[in-house]
């Protein structure tokens, strides 16, 4: 018998490609790993292997686990706001568009609840992550203002936008993790109240 036949079959490694593609694969794999295992449940070597690369490849693109986590969160924000922008362009009255926005936010937070839990932990404990998170929040204020301007809606104060975003984000996290249901709250009623809040903001 050929000795090589007894060796475990190795997973095919991804072909060498452009650095941008390698980085994209690393970030995509890291997003799934952070979401599944949590920030503390993995390390840079495991993240590299999850993308199909050797650990050395990871360090060509990221200094450490924290840096790739920040890249993951930045892309998470991009995806969420792309969906919000598309929902605002969708035909329908303000309440219908608001319902669409609330539903996509709830689904997005539910899909990535593990990643969100790690984000909350790190923003409380790590000043670098906290500053990055606040930078993303400032960017969200600008994105919201631009979306309103593009739709021809009147501008609102940053304080009004902050209250809206804080409310949506915290409620979406609570509902994604079944916190509201555990407290005996009606999820449908919570959704309806969020739709009212978003409708008033459009």
Regions found by a protein language model. Name each.
Residues 56:
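Key DNA-contact positions within bacterial/archaeal DNA-binding proteins
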Residues 20-28, 40-41, 52, 60-85, ...:
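An amphipathic alpha-helix adjacent to DNA-recognition modules
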Residues 1-37, 44-50, 67:
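Basic, helix-initiating cap at the start of DNA-binding domains
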Residues 40-41, 153-156:
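Short, charged helix-capping/linker segments at alpha-helix termini
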Residues 25, 67, 96, 100, ...:
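Amphipathic alpha-helical interaction segments
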Residues 29-33, 108, 167:
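Short amphipathic alpha-helical elements of helix-turn-helix/winged-helix folds
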Residues 78-81, 107-111, 127-152, 159-166, ...:
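Amphipathic alpha-helical packing segments from all-alpha helical-bundle domains
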Residues 106-128, 173-181:
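Amphipathic alpha-helical segments used for helix-helix packing
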